[in-house]
């Protein structure tokens, strides 16, 4: 796990979408992807707690695979490939519902965890967290752990 996951300093990456766009353009130009890498954001919500537990990306192929298998399947922008959530950790999620926003440029997936949390980070008890486990102080911009 990298320092960014444990720091109490706010270090947002405002260039993420620019990087993803360049990666998509490069992949299309090279013709090297198994499927179109064009992506849209997808918010992941826990059906039981109503918490947003992750924001990730999907492309058309990953979306259709999720719908077909009723499992959380995303597109990894860092690895540029299909991401079966929980494939290595065992933290899989059943896909229960999907919603599209008004501009049809992002999705909301409502999921049920099959076992535990969604994040690759763990709290002090060793349990996987949700991805939103640090709260920002508006005045100082310092972070506080809410699931230590």
Q: Could you describe each region identified by the protein language model?
A:
Residues 2-41, 46-148:
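C-terminal binding/interaction regions
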């Amino acid at each position: 796990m990298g320092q960014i996951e444990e720091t109490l300093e706010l270090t947002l990456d405002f260039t993420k979408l620019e990087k993803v766009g360049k990666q998509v353009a490069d992949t299309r130009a090279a013709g090297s992807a198994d499927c179109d890498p064009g992506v849209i954001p997808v918010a992941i919500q826990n059906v039981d707690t109503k918490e947003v537990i992750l924001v990730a990306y999907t492309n058309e192929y990953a979306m259709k695979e999720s719908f077909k298998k009723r499992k959380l399947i995303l597109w990894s922008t860092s690895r540029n490939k299909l991401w079966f959530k929980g494939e290595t950790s065992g933290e899989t999620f059943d896909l229960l519902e999907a919603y599209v926003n008004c501009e049809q440029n992002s999705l909301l997936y409502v999921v049920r965890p099959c076992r535990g949390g969604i994040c690759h980070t763990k709290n002090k008890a060793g349990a996987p967290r949700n991805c939103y486990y640090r709260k920002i102080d508006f005045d100082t911009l310092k972070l506080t752990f809410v699931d230590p």
